[in-house]
């Protein structure tokens, strides 16, 4: 009797044979001698067992698994053989250096193409600015074809192979990516794989009863099954879309976790996996370096559960990862999981998503500004920051999305804080419903049944710049100093670097007025960017401060990697941590001067050089930080 390993080996050899069966003997002989086949075959030998094991754990009893694999790997070979020589070189470079993303040189930016540059041709003209800022990674927010009007900001995709016509063409995107690569900038796009728009060809053909697309989505004849599922589902957008299902014109019901125009894909059908892997390979061959894996928590459904963070979801992502290791190993995955911190980290791994958003740190940065106390942030950095090797956090301050207060209730309780009550405070503080608040945020998706609410707003609005608070600029620089120095890949939400305010016009737009997140999705502010080199302006102070910190980070290997050790400052207002046993970082979250005592610093060297201030400071005496001051001290 064959062992499982032997069985997988036989399947692998069978599939390799089937890939080559379409060729004539002469063609086959040539292919088998080629460098392309040698590399592809080597990668299949390494990664097919992982792919097979993950898919078997999901589809093991499905008779379609083997024929699906046969078609998938034939497609993977075609995709790899058509991959450009330059991309194949990057494949090899990143196989040999999986820590490329952890370099101190890496600094990211993210923007909507239309809002920042008008279209793809306009974005290409902005590359010189991205280089000026120091970016090595650029995330282009959803730019694929989507419904006109409401499209969840582009997250309802009607075609993964067509760019939104208002932005340009696939050819334009290919040119932009090539130009970014020429400038030393990696290209990042969203891979929205939990759902498509209701206008996607697959959705239209599934709804029409096309047998080739049968069961591509969850469509039910009546409410019996949806009612059973809804009992345990969380409402994501309760204001505009209560429940998890939407009714079609013919009376049937379709699963729509997010919005009625976003239909959830049915991954219990293995052909859906194969179809989405094909879209992934298409994007990889455009030159995309990183895929932001959208809504990873939701892709598997199971009756009686929350349909979030299920084991099959992880297995499917690892299977997608294995496909990329075979067909386009240069491509990395970035997880987007805004869930409990215990679950966020489970999506990050070399075989799953190599990098992932750090929503806990983001939320706690704003929490610490509001409370002026670093206890929750210190706790998170101590116990939840360090990741497995070859993986990294994406550390951000703001994004296109709302702020959810994602700290764990049990973490808060350990510090004597009621999670529920503290979230209520934070919501009131950041929407200016709390005495003494400097913030001017906007509430998002208040749920009266649970009391849950999130917050919208740009960094400038939330930090107090809108009302010219004298500390607003320093607050913004402080938050970005943490993102730049805690380890991992820092990400700038473009516009933040010049203090762009909220766009109050969202309430007058019928396609946006029910979604306050549009408040922090403003257009490129030409006047503010024109001020970026003028230190007499807030825009200039923020920009020059961030640009200086980026330059320091990129010139100093002490910022390499992703791990840190927290340093107890014995001052509830000052956060402290050590990077690579060589850099001691301090940040004062108070509007008053704060001190780290000489006694607290007694294990440190007598003197240290402050990389931000450019001065030598004494550590054998009390060290005072001015309001919202940051210090990056070389201690070795």
Swiss-Prot record:
Keyword Repeat: no
CDD domains (alphabetical): AmyAc_Amylosucrase
One of the protein's GO biological processes: carbohydrate metabolic process
Cellular location(s): Secreted
GO CC field: extracellular region
Active site per the UniProt annotation: 294 (nucleophile), 336 (proton donor)
EC number: 2.4.1.4
Main location: secreted
Chain positions recorded as substrate binding sites: 152, 195, 262, 292, 400-401, 517
Annotated catalysed reactions: [(1->4)-alpha-D-glucosyl](n) + sucrose = [(1->4)-alpha-D-glucosyl](n+1) + D-fructose
Positions marked as site (Transition state stabilizer): 452
Example GO molecular function: amylosucrase activity
Protein keywords: Glycosyltransferase, Secreted, Transferase
Lineage top rank: taxon: Bacteria
Subunit record text: Monomer.
Record's function text: Catalyzes the synthesis of alpha-glucan from sucrose. Catalyzes, in addition, sucrose hydrolysis, maltose and maltotriose synthesis by successive transfers of the glucosyl moiety of sucrose onto the released glucose, and finally turanose and trehalulose synthesis, these two sucrose isomers being obtained by glucosyl transfer onto fructose.
Similarity-based family: Belongs to the glycosyl hydrolase 13 family.
Protein name, entry field: Amylosucrase
Source organism: Neisseria meningitidis
The gene coding this protein: ams
């Amino acid at each position: 009797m064959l062992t499982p390993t032997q069985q997988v080996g036989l399947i692998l050899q069978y599939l390799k044979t089937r890939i080559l069966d379409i060729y004539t003997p002469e063609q086959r002989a040539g292919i088998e001698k080629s460098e392309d086949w040698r590399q592809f075959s080597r990668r299949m030998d390494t990664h097919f067992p992982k792919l097979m094991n993950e898919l078997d754990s999901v589809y093991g009893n499905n008779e379609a698994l083997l024929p699906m694999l046969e078609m998938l790997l034939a497609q993977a070979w075609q995709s790899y053989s058509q991959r450009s020589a330059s991309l194949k070189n990057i494949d090899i470079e990143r196989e040999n250096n999986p820590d490329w993303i952890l370099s101190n040189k890496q600094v990211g930016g993210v923007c909507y193409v239309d809002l920042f540059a008008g279209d793809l041709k306009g974005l290409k003209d902005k590359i010189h600015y991205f280089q000026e800022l120091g970016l090595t990674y650029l995330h282009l927010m959803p730019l694929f074809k989507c419904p006109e009007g409401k499209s969840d900001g582009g997250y309802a995709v009607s075609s993964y192979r067509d760019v939104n016509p208002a932005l340009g063409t696939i050819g334009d995107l290919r040119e932009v990516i090539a130009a970014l690569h020429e400038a030393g900038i990696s290209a990042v796009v969203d891979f929205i794989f939990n759902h498509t728009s209701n206008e996607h060809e697959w959705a239209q053909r599934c709804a029409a009863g096309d047998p080739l697309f049968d069961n591509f989505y969850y469509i039910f004849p009546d409410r019996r099954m949806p009612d059973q599922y809804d009992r345990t589902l969380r409402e994501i957008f309760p204001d505009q879309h209560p429940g998890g299902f939407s009714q079609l014109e013919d009376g049937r019901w379709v699963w729509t976790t997010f919005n009625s125009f976003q239909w959830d894909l049915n991954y219990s059908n293995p052909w859906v996996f194969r179809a989405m892997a094909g879209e992934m390979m298409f994007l990889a061959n455009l030159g995309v370096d990183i895929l932001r894996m959208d809504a990873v928590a939701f892709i598997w459904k199971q009756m009686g559960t929350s349909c979030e963070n299920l084991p099959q979801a992880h297995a499917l992502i690892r299977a997608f990862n294995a496909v990329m290791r075979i067909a386009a190993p240069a491509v990395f995955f970035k997880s987007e999981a805004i869930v409990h911190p215990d679950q966020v980290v489970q999506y990050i791994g070399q075989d799953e998503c190599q990098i992932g958003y750090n929503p806990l740190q983001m939320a706690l940065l704003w929490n610490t500004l509001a409370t002026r106390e670093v206890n929750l942030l210190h706790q998170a950095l101590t116990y939840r920051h360090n990741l497995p090797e070859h993986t990294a956090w994406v550390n951000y301050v703001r994004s296109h999305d709302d702020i959810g207060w994602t700290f764990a209730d049990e973490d808060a309780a350990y510090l004597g804080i009621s999670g529920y009550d503290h979230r209520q405070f934070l919501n009131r503080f950041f929407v200016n419903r709390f005495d003494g608040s400097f913030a001017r945020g906007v509430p998002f998706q208040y749920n009266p049944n649970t009391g849950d609410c999130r917050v919208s707003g740009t960094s400038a609005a939330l930090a107090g710049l809108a009302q010219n608070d004298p500390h607003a600029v320093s607050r913004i620089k402080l938050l970005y100093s943490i993102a730049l120095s805690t380890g991992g890949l820092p990400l700038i939400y473009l516009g933040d670097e010049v203090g762009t305010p909220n766009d109050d016009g969202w309430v007058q737009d019928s396609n946006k007025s029910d979604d306050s997140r549009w408040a922090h999705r403003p257009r490129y502010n030409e006047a503010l960017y024109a001020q970026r080199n003028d230190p007499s302006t807030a825009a200039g102070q923020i920009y020059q401060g961030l640009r200086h910190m980026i330059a320091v980070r990129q010139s100093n290997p002490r910022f390499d990697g992703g791990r840190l050790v927290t340093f107890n400052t014995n001052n509830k207002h000052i956060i402290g941590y050590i990077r690579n046993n060589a850099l001691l970082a301090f940040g004062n979250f108070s509007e008053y001067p704060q001190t780290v005592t000489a006694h607290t610093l007694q294990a440190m060297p007598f003197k240290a050089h402050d990389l931000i201030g450019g001065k030598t400071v004494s550590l054998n005496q009390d060290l005072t930080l001015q309001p919202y001051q940051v210090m990056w001290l070389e201690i070795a």
